[in-house]
Curated annotation (Swiss-Prot):
Keywords: Cytoplasm, Protein biosynthesis
Lineage of source species: Bacteria, Pseudomonadati, Pseudomonadota, Alphaproteobacteria, Hyphomicrobiales
Localization annotation: Cytoplasm
Species whose genome carries this gene: Methylorubrum populi (strain ATCC BAA-705 / NCIMB 13946 / BJ001) (Methylobacterium populi)
Stored PANTHER family: MITOCHONDRIAL RIBOSOME RECYCLING FACTOR PSEUDO 1 (PTHR20982:SF3), RIBOSOME RECYCLING FACTOR (PTHR20982)
Protein name: Ribosome-recycling factor
Length: 187
């Protein structure tokens, strides 16, 4: 059986992947503020295939509570409208030629608290993913030390580096959550 390799860089990359995934998930959460990433999960039927909004239109934010969608192909305007209406965002598109405007309504206090709970759920999933990566790294180190490939001192030193990488990733996750929570609760 092959001896597993320990690569701290790989562990850090995998932890960073969990942080990036969290940022993407939180970016799609609706706040009272207009952001182009709000439309990222929406798929538009275009040319016989399902495409992300970014591949058929440009999304801009002319005002804090308004999204402006410039559809590149005039024939796609109704498809983009339909995709927005059928999404679970609860937004009502207003069309003016090839431009679709979306007014983002203010969220009430109860809805804000629900969004914060969802953000916490996503954050906990990211923390768990980071802890799994840490466990994998520590398991590899223990196996290497047990097999005599590294000394006990090296195992302890590298385990400390894995723990530091874990702490850094968790701190970054907490920072992302705090920022999103502030954005959601801002009236």
């Amino acid at each position: 059986m092959a001896t597993p390799e320990f690569d701290l860089g790989d562990i850090k990359r995998r932890m960073q992947g969990a942080v990036s995934s969290l940022s993407k998930d939180l970016g799609s959460l609706r706040t009272g503020r207009a952001t182009p990433s709000l439309l990222d999960p929406i798929q538009v039927e275009a040319y016989g295939a399902s495409m992300p909004m970014a591949q058929v239109a440009t999304v801009s934010v002319p005002e804090p509570r308004l999204l402006s969608i410039s559809v590149w192909d005039r024939s796609m305007v109704t498809n983009v409208e339909k995709a927005i209406r059928e999404s679970d965002l609860g937004l009502n598109p207003m069309t003016e030629g090839q431009t679709i405007r979306l007014r983002i309504p203010e969220m009430n206090e109860q809805r804000r608290k629900e969004m914060v709970k969802v953000a916490h759920k996503y954050t906990e999933e990211a923390r768990v993913a980071v802890r799994h990566v840490r466990r994998d790294g520590l398991d590899i180190l223990k196996k290497l030390e047990k097999d005599g490939a590294i000394s006990e001192d090296d195992e302890k030193r590298q385990a400390g580096e894995v723990q530091k990488a874990t702490d850094d990733a968790i701190a970054e996750i907490d920072g992302v959550l705090a920022s999103k929570e502030k954005e959601i609760m801002q009236v």
